[in-house]
Every structure is written in C-alpha cells, then in structure tokens.
Amino acid sequence: MLANPFVGMPAASAEPCPDVEVVFARGTFEPPGVGGTGQAFVDALQSRLGGKSMEVYPVNYPASLDFQTAANGVIDASNKVQSVAATCPDTKIVLGGFSQGAAVAGYLTADSVPAGYQMPAGLTGPMPADVADHVAAVALFGKPSTGFLQMIANTAPPITVGHLYADKTQDLCIPEDPICSPAGSDSNAHNLYPANGLTDRAAQFVADKLESTTATETAG
C-alpha cells in the first residue's frame, strides 16, 4: 500500500537552528538528495531569502517503483518536521516534493486516515495540528493524480492536502505532464519543472509566505 499521512516519533535535531528548514522528497529513481527539481527549487529559494539562514533536509526513502516504500518517506519526513518544530520553534519549515516525492509531502499534510486504508508499520496517525503552525509553505511539483495512482498502485489513497496546509500550498502541474494531469500525454514534460520556470514560481510563492509569516509574528 502507498504511504499514508501518519507519523512516527520525532528524532533529535541538530543545533543551531536555521531561519528556514526545507524538507524535500525527490522523485522516483533520482539518487539520494533532493533531486534535480528539488535542487533547482532550493537554489531559487535561497536567492530570495536575503540574509536568512537555510538548511535543506533530503527525505530519506527509496524513491523506487515500489510505491509501498513511499511510506518510509512519510515516516522520515514527519519525524524531521516534528523534530524541527519541537527543538527549533522559531524555524520556518518548508515542505516540498517532486513526483513520488510530491506524494510523500502531500500525504504528510493530510487531516485524517483515509477511510478503508490500513496504516503501514511505523505510522501512528496524522501529524499533530499544532505542527502546521511551524510550516510556512508547501511546494509540490508533478504530484501524481488519482488516476495515475490507481494505475500503478491501486491500493493507494488519493493525495489530499489537509485544510491546515491548503492556503500555504502551491501544487504545480505542467498540463502536458501525464503523471499529474489526466490530459497529459508528453512524458518528457514531467522533467521540465526547472526549465519552464515553475521552480522559480514556487520559490517566489514560498519566499512570500515566509515574509508574510515573519511580518505577522512581528506585528503580533
């Protein structure tokens, strides 16, 4: 079964605390790290942060064709997010993912257990609601559509961004990309998010969310 939006126990976080922590899950078959789309996004975001410090955490999971192992990514990402929220409460967290990694990040934001789905081992329930206060923005690139998920993993639940994250999520899909768009028919389009400016668009969206969050806290 594909990963579900449930979490394990938080792990320890290193000090000192950065201003911004990006937690990004790479796409299928990309080598460990954040992947090509992730790196383009991270670089574009860094250039928009001025003097703010930023750390990047590549989600640790197989990113293989076995979508059941995406659960490993949900567990790893949720552990990291909860750890940062607990030990670095002033750090603004940015979630992101490309392709299968966008599924991982999307499931992480879900409100509840999808009806009829069994939780994989190591997942205990949705992330605590107060964790969402520490997440400034979410950037999803080429998130698998429900139809695509059913084609490759028919036990996979649909990916629904939870209400606590919806207003701070940018979900980007190239219309020709068949992974995320039911009408898409050009498989090459799936790898064009950096080339067509969508990683820059997402970086600006996230930078604006980070700025507005900081301004709101300062005013408060």
Which functions belong to the PLM regions below?
Residues 1-14:
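Secretory targeting and sorting signals
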Residues 21, 136-139, 169-170:
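Structural motif
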Residues 43-47, 152-168, 172-174:
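Active-site-adjacent alpha-helix of alpha/beta-hydrolase-fold enzymes
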Residues 74-163:
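Serine-dependent carboxylesterase/thioesterase catalytic core
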Residues 3-6, 107, 200-203:
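Hydrophobic alpha-helical membrane segments, chiefly transmembrane helices and signal peptide h-regions
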Residues 16-92, 172-199, 203, 208-217:
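Active-site catalytic motif of lipid deacylating hydrolases and related acyltransferases
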